[in-house]
Amino acid sequence: MASLKVFSFALILVLTFSVDVEGYNVESGGSLCCNNHPKFGKCNTNNDNQRCNRWCHNGCGNGKGDYCKAMSHGGLCHCYC
């Protein structure tokens, strides 16, 4: 029974950490720099801000990161120029 709990916990961890992986690829060789990214999804909480920062660092060569840009329809991930 304990091995089932360990397996279930490991599976949940893998699924949780793989959620952000699809966003790390830069589409069509373009840069994430200086752009809003609605495809990233919501960007309203501190956790979203940290995910956006990691996403921009991995997809933008300037190493400057990001911020969650407040918009009328909700926050968007915006990578610095």
Swiss-Prot record:
<dbReference type="Pfam" id="PF10868">
    <property type="entry name" value="Defensin_like"/>
</dbReference>
<feature type="signal peptide">
    <location>
        <begin position="1"/>
        <end position="23"/>
    </location>
</feature>
<feature type="disulfide bond">
    <location>
        <begin position="33"/>
        <end position="81"/>
    </location>
</feature>
<keyword id="KW-0732">Signal</keyword>
<protein>
    <recommendedName>
        <fullName>Putative defensin-like protein 25</fullName>
    </recommendedName>
</protein>
<dbReference type="GO" id="GO:0050832">
    <property type="term" value="P:defense response to fungus"/>
</dbReference>
<keyword id="KW-0964">Secreted</keyword>
<feature type="disulfide bond">
    <location>
        <begin position="56"/>
        <end position="79"/>
    </location>
</feature>
<dbReference type="GO" id="GO:0005576">
    <property type="term" value="C:extracellular region"/>
</dbReference>
<keyword id="KW-0929">Antimicrobial</keyword>
<dbReference type="InterPro" id="IPR022618">
    <property type="entry name" value="Defensin-like_20-28"/>
</dbReference>
<keyword id="KW-1015">Disulfide bond</keyword>
<keyword id="KW-0611">Plant defense</keyword>
<feature type="disulfide bond">
    <location>
        <begin position="52"/>
        <end position="77"/>
    </location>
</feature>
<feature type="disulfide bond">
    <location>
        <begin position="43"/>
        <end position="68"/>
    </location>
</feature>
<keyword id="KW-0295">Fungicide</keyword>
<comment type="similarity">
    <text>Belongs to the DEFL family.</text>
</comment>
<dbReference type="GO" id="GO:0031640">
    <property type="term" value="P:killing of cells of another organism"/>
</dbReference>
